């Protein structure tokens, strides 16, 4: 636990080739053979269960360099944001068969630029983590140490709280709000709803979409915010009934997929009945489980907002 915390960027650098290897095997074997093979291995030796919703590897270094190279005239204070991409979104990109083309970090950057924001990344963000991983493994001291390290980096990046901080994963933001008290912290739905509404022109679609409200959003009292944001983008928002917690529970959906499947057993029939082909949420791991058990792709609500908005022209 302590070793992983102290060598976090190296751990992610090990994980990326594993994801790439799995994706290459998927490309060569196809979804059916790959699913059967890994299911057998999961039952035999306990390796994580692979599904076609598993992501490809991702590294945000290229988008960071692009922002530095393209940085133009600095924006006023009210148009600056510190963006901390969560560990999972720094490591995991899109699934091979995702309907989207850009990984979430790239899409978040694109949307913020559309709204006229200057983006500040915290220094050495590849080493940073909110600590949720260690907290879930029963290592609170390590978790709090990582949270303190993150707080120091975010205070520096935000010039002691002058700018809001955006994290793209709702469970991470939930823990950050409990451990970091000096900063204004947001996940994508609340940030967009609060700060970007007047900077974007919304053009809602009539296409039906599914919305999953994560447990962390409910705990933070933000279920209404993400629902209202979805309704700015679509005139046909469907929130499935009797589908509460998705059951993915951090990384347990990889090691105990049957819990995820049971929690979402009532999802797919409702999706099929409504003829919906895309769903939105704001937690990458939840979206992996939702995609696996619904028969449709679930992605971040950031993609929906970007798809349904134009830059608002100044009058």
Task: Please describe what each predicted stretch is.
Residues 1-315:
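Iron-sulfur cluster-binding electron-transfer modules in prokaryotic oxidoreductases
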